[in-house]
Structures are given as C-alpha cells and as structure tokens.
Regions:
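Short, well-ordered beta-strand segments
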Residues: 34-36, 157, 217, 243
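Short, solvent-exposed amphipathic alpha-helices that sit
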Residues: 43-58, 140-143, 165-185, 226, ...
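Helix N-cap/beta->alpha junction signal
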Residues: 137, 167, 219-221
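Alpha-helical recognition/docking segments in bacterial nutrient-uptake
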Residues: 24, 28-146, 206-211, 215
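Short beta-strand elements in bilobed, periplasmic/extracellular small-molecule ligand-binding domains
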Residues: 56-68, 156-158, 175-200
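N-terminal helix-turn-helix DNA-binding module of bacterial transcription factors
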Residues: 1-30
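Flexible loop/turn connectors
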Residues: 186, 203-293
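An alpha-beta-alpha
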Residues: 142-182, 285-293
Length: 293
C-alpha cells in the first residue's frame, strides 16, 4: 500500500473508485484512447464502436476514432499524427495483415513512448510484444465447413480476401475440415479477391461458383448477401447453401436468408476490457474468441 501511495504521489498511477489503480505514464495523453480502424460505416462497426466506447467510458476514458480505409498510406499518416500527441493507449485493427506492413517502425516508436498497443481482429505477427484480441478464424472455418459436410454438401466453394490474415485462416480451417473427410475441393473452387478492389474479384468468383457448387462459404455477410441476391436474380436460381461469418442483420434482410456464424462474445467489449487491464499494469496475453453456430 505504501508503494502504491508513493507511485500515486509521483503521478505514475492514479486511483479510480471501484476499478483500482491505473498507470498514467509521464505523458498521460489526458484520458484519451485512440482507435485505429479500417472503417466506421460497414455493418460490423457501429456495434463494435458502441461496445468499445461504452466499456472505456465507464472507467472515465474518452475515445478518438481514426479510419485507415485499410490502406498503408493512410495508416502511416495517422500514426505520424498520433506520435506527436500519444494517447494513453492505442487499439488497432491491422491493415492488409497478410502482406508486409511498412509502418511497423511507427508502432515500435509509440511503444517506446509508453503507449500500450492492442490489436483487434487483425494483427501484425511481426509485433510479437503487442497482444491481440482476434476471432478464432481457423476454428470458425472448421466449424462452418463441418456443418455443411454434415448436411450432405460435397462441392463446397469459397470466397476470401487474399490480403487479410483472417481470410487466410478461415480458408485454412475450411481446407482442414475438408481434408479430414478426403473431400478437398478443386483449386478453382477457392476464389480470392483484394480488399481495396473487392467488386471485380467477388463478381468473377460468384459467376464461377454459382454454377459449380452446392454450398459456398463467404468471408463475411456483405459478400454472402450479394451472393444470395445474385442467385435469386437468375432466371432459374439453383439451390445453393450460402454460409458466412458475423451473423449481422444482413442474414435476414428482406427476403434474403443465409447461415452465418456468431461470435461467442462481443469482440469490442473484450478488447476494451483487455486494454483496461494493460492500463492497470496487468500482464495480458493474446486471446481468441470462438465462433458458434
């Protein structure tokens, strides 16, 4: 107790009624926590932001949201700006995480300024000392594919982003489940697109898979919804099961309906909780949130 009292007098920690002591650091960045996200408008983000802000605000922290648009150049500009006035902590959704990132040095500079960095959903494996809260995408790929196999599907295709680690992991999980049954798909049934130019790749994938598969695994609900619409617009729509991840309102929007996995826990709330532990000086480790049917 005496040691905590000394640290509080020196401004290195602060006590908050009902929630313990928090590290302030020499440059507190006031009580601001910055969020670096790829978007704030796609279907996932309103609830994600709500959960993060609600959890942090309950402990007296404000949030500033920066949007990278999933581009390295915008991420670079924003990190340079953040470095000039570091926040208490930084919560980041990584950019094109399956590619080499040119901005890793800026994250390391932030860490040297005693700014904790936590990754959410998409992380950079090179930053081994930065914990992350991600979905168990490998396990999700297995779960979804095993469900499709159990319902009698043998020709299963997929549409994934080639530049996002979550897309690669979902694909790996799918292939793992198929391999266990000896039902590996033809290479042409696994289709890829790039996240900053999705329309071209996704449209080509749809045209190919609709005529070749009985079930199609989509990276997210946006693609799944577009696929369902494309199938229903055909003169003679084939019977295709569409499966996805996220379980958003798009699963039951209008006359469209498809299967989509649900996070077992709200990612935003979990990430904000982990970040608060970091600010309290508690050692945290990376964690994966499972998917459920």
């Amino acid at each position: 107790r005496q040691a905590l009292s000394v640290l509080e007098q020196e401004g290195l920690i602060e006590k908050r009624q009902g929630s313990g002591s928090y590290i302030t650091g020499r440059s507190r960045g006031e009580d601001r926590i910055d969020l670096l996200l790829s978007s704030d408008s796609a279907y996932l983000y309103p609830m994600l932001l709500h959960d993060i802000k609600k959890t942090l605000a309950a402990q007296g922290f404000s949030t500033t949201v920066h949007i990278t648009e999933n581009t390295f150049s915008t991420e670079h500009t924003l990190l340079q700006k953040i470095l000039h006035q570091p926040p208490r902590a930084l919560l980041v959704e990584g950019v094109k995480t399956a590619r080499t990132n040119p901005n890793l040095d800026l994250y390391r500079k932030l860490q040297k300024k005693k700014c904790p960095v936590l990754f959410l959903q998409e992380s950079y494996p090179e930053l081994t000392n930065c914990p992350c809260v991600t979905m168990d995408d490998f396990g999700g790929g297995i779960l979804l594919t095993r469900h499709l196999l159990a319902t009698g599907h043998t020709r299963i295709g997929a549409i994934f982003p080639a530049d996002m680690r979550s897309g690669l992991l979902r694909c790996q999980g799918m292939l793992h489940a198929l391999r266990d049954t000896g039902a590996l798909p033809e290479d042409s049934l696994i289709c890829w697109y790039f996240s900053n130019d999705p329309d071209y790749g996704i449209q080509k994938a749809m045209q190919k898979l609709i005529s070749s598969c009985t079930a199609i695994v989509c990276y997210n609900d946006t693609i799944a919804y577009a696929l369902c619409r494309a199938v229903s617009d055909l003169p003679q729509p084939p019977e295709i099961t569409v499966a996805s991840f996220d379980h958003s309102y798009l699963c039951h929007f209008g006359h469209t309906e498809f299967l989509s996995l649900t996070p077992a826990e709200a990612p935003g709330s979990r990430a904000a909780g982990v970040l608060l532990h970091q600010l309290q000086g508690i050692l945290v480790s990376s964690t994966e949130i499972p998917w459920k049917l």
